[in-house]
Amino acid sequence: FVNGGEDLEKAILHAVTGWKNGGACFVPKSCGQIINYVSAHDNFTLWDKLVLSLHQEKADFDRHYEDVYAANKLAAFIYFTCQGNLFLQAGEEFGRTKQGEDNSYCSTPELNMIRWHRTVEYGELVEYYKGLISLRKCLPGLCDKSPDAAARITCGRIHGEGVVSFLVDNQDVRPSLWEELFIVYNASSEEQRIEMPEQGG
């Protein structure tokens, strides 16, 4: 979706509810049974996946590509705003690379090590992830793991290729900063004007 995949809008809207509303060959009892992630230790890092898919033959994993940076941020925003549990690969928040190696468990320590200097080089991305973590803590509508949590997500809409939106009921027993959230994912290359729907509309 974030790197140009087509016809994934429905799947993205299903992912938002932790697949509780269907769309897969299974229906979890609650979104608490779902782990949301975009990279793991035994696959490509997110950064490497994006560099390979967006730049293919000319892939330079140490280069700061603006389109890869933007796609990384959108991927993080998407899974931080989905119901379910979050999982991050160590270093994802600063564009960790394993130089395109997808299964590095037998690779050298030099390839697998965390390159801490990237926390400075990609400091803006680190701050973005910190912001998402802080924001997530303020969103009971997305952190709800109950069997009824999916009912908090309404008005899921597809607005064209790479663009979806939905409303989140963010009310809680404790006062919340926002009672309702309107979330839009725009993976297209164009700015979009999206009307906020009426609740229940």
PLM features: residue spans?
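A broad, low-specificity signal marking well-ordered, structured residues that form hydrophobic/aromatic
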Residues: 35-37, 112, 164, 192
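Short, glycine/charged-enriched secondary-structure capping and boundary segments
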Residues: 102-105, 197-199
